[in-house]
Amino acid sequence: MARPKNVKYVFVTGGVISSLGKGILSASLGMLLKSRGLRVAIQKYDPYINVDPGTMSPYQHGEVYVTDDGAETDLDLGHYERFLDESTSQASNLTMGRVYKSVIDKERKGEYLGGTVQVVPHVIDEIKDRLAELAKKGNYDVIITEIGGTIGDIESLPFLEAMRQMKLDMGERNLLNIHLTFVPYIKAASELKTKPTQHSVKMLLETGIQPDILVCRSEKPLSREIKNKVGHFCNVNDLDVIGLNDCDTIYEVPLTLLQEKLDMRVLKKLGLKQYHEPDLAKWTDFCRKVKHPEGGEVNVAICGKYTEYPDAYKSILEALVHAGASNNVKVNIRLIRAEDGESKSYDFSKELAGINGILVAPGFGDRGIEGKIEFIRYAREQNIPFLGICLGMQCASVEFARNVCGLPDANSTEFNKRSRFPVIDLMEQQKKVKEKGGTMRLGSYPCIIREGTKAHAVYGKFLINERHRHRFEFNNTFRPAFEEHGMIFSGTSPNGELVEIIEIRDHRWFVAVQFHPELKSRVEKVHPLFHGFVGAAKAYADGVHQPELGARAEVHETPSPAPAPVQQGFAAGENIGTPSFFIEEERPAGDGGQGLS
């Protein structure tokens, strides 16, 4: 593996139990190093055999995070982007399935010259080459790699062996391991117990890896005595034992780690001296607004199919946190099962009493669809602020067709192929697609926004780029009927063929989008649609008839000039990808096709 010069590597591993927060730790460290002036890249290595999480159940994996270049990745990449305000790419997420697939493909092509293909060296070399590939994509000072799973998992062993070999090849001044462990608090004994951490480090040592820094997650702060004990039994300097007790919000984790001097220990061990003091004033102010907002509270209901597992909507939940801070209000979230709305005994006025905004979340399949449609109908008829995302927009179109346009059999062909009024239909390019993984319309595409609409008011610009993950689209045959009954098509693809944003003219805030705005919301750059939605919910809660639609200046980028006239008359099935003359920002280069048209 040819390693680019001067790049330093940090590997983050976890022990004792899962869900300790390796992703938040990695993102927080990356944010701190970036705030000191270093160029940081961050990635996730997942040990499962799936090529990517695109076809995995939300109940097992949580949300699928889509990057600009169309990669379907782990939700931790969302944390990376939100904390660092940097876009990730296909190269930022590597699964063991992708590694094995690449090795097997090379063997079939004869690239191993008839040799016996083994985990060592072939699989390990493939992992090391992928890391070098990311390093070559940018001029980075530090690359942080989170290794998924828990020490002791069989699936993680090749990743750990690759890390061991790399440290031997590069030297201790170029690569270090941060091991996140759990120090449980035993309430009956009023004690923090270090034995699980000791055993976790012992298991890591069995792979040939001595951790350089230990981050100890705990319910209570670690005393100096506890840190000394952990350092003594784990062969780590007590200054390299970092305490990370529970925080009120994940956005306080970087501030806690800064106080514990984690970033300074990393800089010292890697021999990095060119840095400056971090300015976290805006971040600190954001945390203050999250914890102690001065503008009151709003109540938002999220109607979805996977509400039993909130990680399925992780980016939506975080985007609402960002929007709460930007509006200086606390956003109380109520997760509601879509199926509940299908019951004839469900009392919407009672169950949604006190709700100031309704968001219908994305998803796939027909389960709960009629319930989503009923929640949308209630939001429309009661003039409650509404935001629909992806499938939420498609359901909003079906509801409007049935109950406003007088098309009672209206539906999506995803749910009823024989509908007389298929207002949502399979995209022309998708009709011959047989495989499921990586074949949807994925990644960042441009959208032209119509002036004088709510969408234009919150974005403050005519041209935007948003991330997509869908196969079905609005059927343009029905656009005249929708417009006649008060629907505004406020955002479309540059050629005018794909409907991206819809809104109702006479509703205080009824906006639905085909794309996923939640994927681009950041701590210091809240997404305009979420800012506008929460602002509308606040106005509704305050009894204001019409909310102020303009977004704050720092919420969105500088408004761009009006684009050239939109081209019309594209033939069905013609390429509706991203024309070069409409590209607003370059996509990060990926390492494989992800179904982009």
From Swiss-Prot:
PROSITE patterns on file: GATASE_TYPE_1
GO-annotated biological processes: 'de novo' CTP biosynthetic process; pyrimidine nucleobase biosynthetic process
Alphabetical UniProt keywords: ATP-binding, Glutamine amidotransferase, Ligase, Magnesium, Metal-binding, Nucleotide-binding, Pyrimidine biosynthesis
EC number(s) given by UniProt: 6.3.4.2
Positions contributing to Mg(2+) binding: D76, E146
Binding site for L-glutamine: Y59, G363, L391, G392, M393, Q394, E414, R471
UniProt-annotated catalytic positions: C390 (nucleophile), H516, E518
Gene Ontology CC, one term: cytosol
GO MF, one annotated term: CTP synthase activity
Reactions listed under catalytic activity: UTP + L-glutamine + ATP + H2O = CTP + L-glutamate + ADP + phosphate + 2 H(+); L-glutamine + H2O = L-glutamate + NH4(+); UTP + NH4(+) + ATP = CTP + ADP + phosphate + 2 H(+)
Coiled coil spans: none
Control of this protein's activity: Allosterically activated by GTP, when glutamine is the substrate; GTP has no effect on the reaction when ammonia is the substrate. The allosteric effector GTP functions by stabilizing the protein conformation that binds the tetrahedral intermediate(s) formed during glutamine hydrolysis. Inhibited by the product CTP, via allosteric rather than competitive inhibition.
NCBIfam families the UniProt entry points to: PRK05380.1, PyrG
Protein name: CTP synthase
Gene name tied to this protein: pyrG
